[in-house]
Amino acid sequence: MLIPKRVKYRRQHRPHRSGVSKGGNRITFGDYGIQALEPAYITNRQIESARIAINRHVKRGGKVWINIFPDRPLTQKPLGVRMGSGKGPVEKWVANVKPGRILFEMSFPNEEVALEALRRAGQKLPCKVRIVKKEDQF
């Protein structure tokens, strides 16, 4: 699972989900990518599930890059606990994703297999995504 090794503060405020991505919105490493179309918190489990979906479909060959990292903790108090008495424990780690962000990149010789693998990975994510190609970028 993807979690930070060490953080300065264990509990943080929730990040803002408004606006568009300022960086990371172009394919830099691979030939194909998954781009977010709406804001979302993507957990470490969802990232891992999408990565496994890509690797299972392509079997051998190619390379996958994960461009997001879940560096923000989300806390939650237990069910049935009254208000007050401090912030709850860390429940999960999330990556704050804004529209336009490239989430995954991939290089693979066969275009049809690569696009199908990215489509399957996009179904594991909690936001609307689209598949982009490097040559389509301007």
Swiss-Prot record:
The keyword Ribosomal protein applies. Belongs to the universal ribosomal protein uL16 family. GO terms for biological process: translation. The keyword Nucleus does not apply. SUPFAM superfamilies: Ribosomal protein L16p/L10e. Pfam families: Ribosomal_L16. Residues 1-19 have a biased composition (Basic residues). The lineage of its organism: Bacteria, Bacillati, Actinomycetota, Actinomycetes, Mycobacteriales. It comes from Corynebacterium diphtheriae (strain ATCC 700971 / NCTC 13129 / Biotype gravis). This is Large ribosomal subunit protein uL16. GO terms for cellular component: cytosolic large ribosomal subunit. InterPro entries: Ribosomal_uL16 (IPR047873), Ribosomal_uL16_bact-type (IPR000114), Ribosomal_uL16_CS (IPR020798), Ribosomal_uL16_dom (IPR016180), Ribosomal_uL16_sf (IPR036920).
